[in-house]
Amino acid sequence: MNIRPLHDRVIVKRLEEETKSAGGIVLTGSAAEKSTRGEVVAVGNGRILESGDVRALEVKAGDTVLFGSYVEKVEKIEGQEYLIMREDNILGIVG
C-alpha cells in the first residue's frame, strides 16, 4: 500500500470477527457484528499541538488495536478495505 496518513490519522485493516457464537452457532449476515479490532498499517507523523510542537503517536504499524464502532472513513485502496481514523478513536493496543 502506497499511502501515508497526515498528522494524527491512522490507517487500520479490520480483522475478521468470529462467525460462531460462544455456543457454536454460526452467525450470518446482520447477526455477525463487524469487528472493532484491526491491524495498524500506517500512521501519520503526529498531532500538532497549540504550541506548534508535534506529539508522536503511541500506535505504530503492525500493532493490533481495538477501536470504537464509529469510524471516520472507510476507503478501498488497491481493492482492500481500510479504515482511516484519528488516534483518539483507538481504545487500546492488544498484547
From Swiss-Prot:
InterPro entries xref list: Chaperonin_GroES, Chaperonin_GroES_sf, Chaprnonin_Cpn10_CS, GroES-like_sf
Keywords (A to Z) from UniProt: Chaperone, Cytoplasm
Disulphide bridges: none
Localization per Swiss-Prot or TrEMBL: Cytoplasm
Keyword Transmembrane helix: no
Similarity comment: Belongs to the GroES chaperonin family.
PANTHER family: 10 KDA HEAT SHOCK PROTEIN, CO-CHAPERONIN GROES
The protein, known as: Co-chaperonin GroES
Gene: groES
